[in-house]
């Protein structure tokens, strides 16, 4: 009873703030789950993609010098930016790196635990970089240490490919329309990956796609 009286004396303000934060967090988690579920239906396993693309045929893409790094959250699937680049530009770089960046539940990561490198084929490698939650995620600097593994490339002749999704609300998404709009607004307000990961601005290529959520 005493706590109810405090609501009339301004106690409703922290209650409203807490409710707003709860709605925002729940919307973000729910919207992200829906988005991942929808994109999963169109994903192509990376191993299958590499096998098909490296099979010699009259339709093989042209090869260009240099290294292409494709950022993705799912290292098991061919990144959307890679697929769009092939579709529109019909080229494949000499070296292609599928890069995943993880933030782990530690303040900092020891240098020997910073990365793992997996060779998928002569042209494709899969790399995972790990950062602690207190570290600045300087990807260009971290990639320079990969030379120890034999994965050598000149950062200034390397192109970073990012997939950018334009989200479109769907009445059948599983969330109310206002929540669709809130999720899209939150996604649009997120930090630009090229800035967050400190990628050289003149080496970044963004390829967009429409996704209905």
Swiss-Prot record:
Bilayer topology reads: Multi-pass membrane protein
Q: Does the keyword Ion transport apply?
A: yes
Q: Where are the transmembrane segments?
A: 10-28
Q: Which residues form the signal peptide?
A: none
From the UniProt record, list the reaction(s) this protein catalyses.
K(+)(in) + H(+)(in) = K(+)(out) + H(+)(out)
- Give the highest taxon in the source lineage: Bacteria
Q: Tell me yes or no: is Membrane among this UniProt entry's keywords.
A: yes
Could you state a single Gene Ontology molecular function term? potassium ion transmembrane transporter activity
Gene Ontology terms: cellular component: plasma membrane
Q: Which UniProt keywords apply?
A: Cell inner membrane, Cell membrane, Ion transport, Membrane, Potassium, Potassium transport, Symport, Transmembrane, Transmembrane helix, Transport
Its predominant location is: membrane
Q: Which InterPro entries match?
A: K+_transporter (IPR003855), K_trans_C (IPR053952), K_trans_N (IPR053951)
Provide the protein's localization: Cell inner membrane
In which family does this protein belong, per the annotation? Answer: Belongs to the HAK/KUP transporter (TC 2.A.72) family.
Functional summary from the UniProt entry: Transport of potassium into the cell. Likely operates as a K(+):H(+) symporter.
Question: What protein am I looking at?
Answer: Probable potassium transport system protein Kup
Gene behind the chain: kup
